[in-house]
Amino acid sequence: MLTPIGIVIMTAYTVGMLYSVVYDKLRTPTQRVGKVLLSVGEGILLYTGSIYFVILSLSMIALSALSVLTSPSAKEYLRWELARIEAAGGKSWGVNATVAVTAGATSLGVLGLYGVMVTWGIA
């Protein structure tokens, strides 16, 4: 059974995912619609079965990383952004390393959220 804090956490996660769609520059309009549907689906699954949330989230992360790595325009845009960061005095990163680190960190965040949900008895 869900606790009130569980409902707040799950709702905040879903709203955060939907908010990120607005600022996602690497996706086409069709992909943004897909991400909205996926976010809503995740929100529903959070209420019904958290293990499905973990599987769906990790699958989405893997597919997103794969789509960036296989899209020449996405890689070029990411390369351009990384060059801007480096020109501003930031650390130099390659496209593949950036995607791998981002996917890894996001996956750890999902697993951490699931751990919190299990610990608090939400999941």
Predicted regions and their residues:
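Short alpha-helical packing/oligomerization segments
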Residues: 44-77
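Juxtamembrane boundary at the C-terminal end of a transmembrane helix
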Residues: 110-123
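Lipid-exposed faces of alpha-helical membrane segments in multi-pass integral membrane proteins
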Residues: 8-15, 37-40, 59-62
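Interfacial loop-to-transmembrane junctions
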Residues: 81-107
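Short hydrophobic membrane-inserting alpha-helices and related fusion/pore-forming segments
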Residues: 1-7, 48-57, 108
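Short, amphipathic, aromatic/basic-enriched membrane-interface segments that mark the entry/exit
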Residues: 19-37
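N-terminal signal-anchor/start-transfer transmembrane helix
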Residues: 4-25
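Hydrophobic, membrane-inserted alpha-helices
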Residues: 35-47
